[in-house]
């Protein structure tokens, strides 16, 4: 065995062994307990960043631990390969998105291998490959046949110069990123999947997810946002038709003083036809962002249409206003407005001088001037005719009953969740498998004609999608008649909503899934990824799983049993500000930090010019803050095991991990020390088989530390996952080993057990060095196939224990006692201590309190 630790050599040997033996290949083994561990697959952006490294290290550590528990472990890896960044990179580098994507995949795959992640590469998939998206297209046609897919008009960002649809991130300050033109809102037909049909299931089944973070479940509950309310109609005054609204507060119906409609509402368009000012206002609204977050903060603006509704219960007229905060996509595009009891309605009414009426009074609340502030709480009805005096809950039911009896309303459950719009007017995505016949009817592409292939050898002009620009690409035939292929592509969340299932049978050519394989592996036992995916990805995956279940492809209700959301990797930021407050950020490696003589008040200087830079807050590693660290450089300098060990030691998985070069160096020293201890031990030769009965007290103490380490690591893996505290325990064990000087046969046997334990419990975290050291410790088998060390509870028992002795609650002595000592023996030992006797002189003992294993407290006066 070499005396010094050479990470590169050690890691190459281990990786060569895993590659040559296909060590992580797994198949279904009925009768053997399975464990499916999955980390969210990456977008192939070009290089791994530290966020990737942390995510995949956590997943690999869990997988390797479960393998040592004797389970059949599946840990696959693939690529979420479609998306807008590939189109942008293609333009920038003058290369086709496909070529750019496949080159990135090759580079990043090699990086993952260098980090020693135990993936079954036989199952690798890339979502941009036709053999993958073929089955997504087929599944979409099945949903269409079941009535779960439909097409409707929907609002998009339209660039009038480039004549193209822009993604939200391509709209910068209201202008197109490429043309600089003012972006318009435009209605175009788009495909939707009826996720709302599954809203109740998606909500209720959150209760089944016992091992998901409560925060994620709350975010999904709020996103689905089930509400009970009343849907009813206002008749229009001097106009045919009516206006449908939904409210969760029918108790406030007598306080309606106006109705607000969306700028795209047919009534708004009708009114604008004879009102140029209103037409201009509607045009301005076209350029308004429609994200809810934007709606909440933007200025509320509106205009009177000149139309009125008739209040269904008072028969009084109320004006209809167009308001820029009402969305056509939500409900019917109209809302009843009660400014006395809704803050947004109140703000709008004050701005435009609309009446404000109080119909709710809150008992025991301070008097509120309704003209100054809305009362949003529930309470007792006032000024409400026959409903006056009722509580809000009583009025809810009474108003609902009255509107139902009148035939103009009914109680209704509503969800904030909207159907999933899956159309994207981009090129680099899976083509939507629908065709339009000459008579305008839509038909799904038959299975025999799938996949609808995306051409990969294309030139990008930055304006139109190549498949939209090529008139020949969309020419198809259906039953011998001409048809036009849909040129929109799927939202990339489609691909990531079922990839976890395809990993169960990625090479199956005849079907989307093999139910036998899928039902053996699914649900995923442990899913690791960032909290930023709490809503969209995790909600869509749960939805897709239920769709797969209803198609008979899987028999479980939920895709992921346990979810771990890892924290961010954060690092220091350094910058300079120019006179216009524009910040230029510098990488921490290019900065020198100096402390004063007391080791405080840090100051930072740019190494290049020696001039000061501002020390900013610690923030998530990112390109924009220039505070990232290239994992490749760390692997080259310290080795993959050091990077993995730092990642697991610096913080528990759910918390933010603060980057520290000195911390990385510390972990590297620890591994060198482990290597040296094993080297010193194996050079001695002469360990006898361990005989517990023969051990002396010093040997038993070291063995106790060994088994305390096993207990701690096992507890952390099985419960809290605070592996950092387990690693700290291994460090303590190595400290004990460094101090242990006993080369007798049983002394060496205890050291052998301690070193084997250290190597085994660290094997999931630092697999390369463990692979090498396990062999050096005399084992024929490989450490990855070794079982997890067994805890000997007897080894944890202590012959003697230390107790604290207090006199009147103050510490006066520490005493050693036999672990088996009874209460009387402990009392005698305490009274015999000289220091204790000094504090009891000339005093009377009132009582003695003994807490076995901890303390003796003598109360005197």
From Swiss-Prot:
Keyword Lipid metabolism annotated: no
One GO biological process term: leucyl-tRNA aminoacylation
Keyword Cell membrane: no
GO cellular component: cytosol
Compartment list: Cytoplasm
Residues bound to ATP: 623
Record-linked PROSITE patterns: AA_TRNA_LIGASE_I
UniProt EC number: 6.1.1.4
Catalytic activity from the UniProt record: tRNA(Leu) + L-leucine + ATP = L-leucyl-tRNA(Leu) + AMP + diphosphate
Record-linked Pfam families: Anticodon_1, tRNA-synt_1, tRNA-synt_1_2, tRNA-synt_1g
InterPro entries: aa-tRNA-synth_I_CS (IPR001412), aa-tRNA-synth_Ia (IPR002300), Leu-tRNA-ligase (IPR002302), Leu_tRNA-synth_edit (IPR025709), M/V/L/I-tRNA-synth_anticd-bd (IPR013155), Methionyl/Leucyl_tRNA_Synth (IPR015413), Rossmann-like_a/b/a_fold (IPR014729), tRNAsynth_Ia_anticodon-bd (IPR009080)
Family listed: Belongs to the class-I aminoacyl-tRNA synthetase family.
Name of protein: Leucine--tRNA ligase
Species this protein is from: Hahella chejuensis (strain KCTC 2396)
Gene (UniProt): leuS
